[in-house]
Amino acid sequence: MSQRSSELISDSWKGSSSEELFERAKIVSPGGVHSPVRSFRSVGGTPVFFVSANGATLTDVSGKEYVDFCLSFGPLILGHRDPEVEEVVRETAGLAWSFGTAEPYSLELAEFITNRIPWAEKVRFVNSGTEAVMSALRVTRAATGREKIFKFDGCYHGHLDALLVKAGSGLAGESSSDSAGISSTAIANTLVLPLDDEMAVQKLFESEGKNIAALIIEPLPANYGLLVQRKEFLLKIVEIAKKYGTLVVFDEVISGFRTGFQGMSGLLGIRPDLVTYGKIIGGGFPVGCYAGRRDLLDLVAPSGPVYQAGTLSANPFGMRAGLATLKKAERDSIYSVLEVRTKTFADEMVKLLNGKTDQEWEAVTHSSLFWFRKKTQQAVRRIDQIPEGHKEGFAEVFHVLLKNGIYLAPSGYEVGFLSWAHNDSVIAKVLEIADKAFKEL
């Protein structure tokens, strides 16, 4: 690095603690963060300020290292700065940072996706999962001529006004409107029901079916805990929706390319009309997309009348890092290995935890996702079934692990993730640390 370029780098944070930086941040940013859950408001305390990451490890401003099970809330399925993906990113930096034009990199990623997902006949890239959902729902309204959108209590689909109604973890415990500043007209056409109740869905469609443009659901709800749904329930609600001419949108921003190349749609054998993706498809860069039936995507401008655009959509870093990530995941056959490793890890963690505390915990896992929660007599499929005291109990577990260098997402309603970098030696190290840490509870 030349002296000239080094002058452009600001390192005013060096020598400061997380506590000091948080106080500075609160002066210039709302709550000191740029996404609410990062503030530690769900678990209490001061958020840790991280400055670097590699593999399964985060390093904070003081130089302390942590094994990371948050992984930027899901995108980093290969771990931080996977060497092969990093090589692609460095090469991209020498080519272009942004075009705002047609380019071949988005073509390659789109072809990769459509070649592996039969129902993804066309793809449109955007910059986030929220944008993907917003755009997909606009398409459903244009295609059906209907106004209403039907979602489920506890499923989070981004921070667009119409769907911030009984949403996910960052809103857990807040008012029923979920956010100030949302007009009544914005949510007037949003219908909401609890998960895991086919009869309620049937009754809703009997009265409103002809007005519902889209049924949107996370087929693996993972924003208010890990609420694994019955396949029978998912099959039935799709059947009901299709009977009434309602388009089915699967929000696979988290589960897409996390549960396998075809996501939950493939595992369930369900062909949704539209699917939204994000997180993993960008390889750690801000990317989202919506994909699905050719006739529906052809409604999007410039092919059709549905307008959607974005200055940084299909940015070369996200396209190339995303493609490299997916190619490596496919080449190394990571999914089955990660599924077994995740279940083994989560079960062992709970076994250690239950041996050190009078509270009984259990692990819920799916693919490479996990969720620690208070033990219940029945499967938890709805938010009203989450046991009382879970949030407070998780906060205690979170802080004792954080103190000992294990970083979970800072909310009892967020899920955890394993990456390809969480190999057997990393897991063994974490279990050894946790065994000692839980004695502090």
Swiss-Prot record:
Reaction catalysed by this enzyme: (S)-4-amino-5-oxopentanoate = 5-aminolevulinate
Keyword Phosphoprotein found: no
EC number: 5.4.3.8
Annotated Pfam families: Aminotran_3 (PF00202)
Molecular function GO terms recorded: glutamate-1-semialdehyde 2,1-aminomutase activity; pyridoxal phosphate binding; transaminase activity
InterPro entries to which the protein is assigned, alphabetical: 4pyrrol_synth_GluAld_NH2Trfase, Aminotrans_3, Aminotrans_3_PPA_site, PyrdxlP-dep_Trfase, PyrdxlP-dep_Trfase_major, PyrdxlP-dep_Trfase_small
Location, primary (coarse class): cytoplasm
GO cellular component: cytoplasm
Broad enzyme group: isomerase
Associated pathway: Porphyrin-containing compound metabolism; protoporphyrin-IX biosynthesis; 5-aminolevulinate from L-glutamyl-tRNA(Glu): step 2/2
A biological process from GO: protoporphyrinogen IX biosynthetic process
Entry keyword set: Cytoplasm, Isomerase, Porphyrin biosynthesis, Pyridoxal phosphate
Coiled coil regions in record: none
Signal sequence extent: none
Modified residues (N6-(pyridoxal phosphate)lysine): 279
Cofactor(s) it depends on: pyridoxal 5'-phosphate
Localization of this protein: Cytoplasm
Keyword hit for tRNA processing: no
Annotated NCBIfam families: PRK00062.1
UniProt similarity note: Belongs to the class-III pyridoxal-phosphate-dependent aminotransferase family. HemL subfamily.
SUBUNIT field: Homodimer.
Protein name: Glutamate-1-semialdehyde 2,1-aminomutase
Lineage of the organism: Bacteria, Pseudomonadati, Spirochaetota, Spirochaetia, Leptospirales
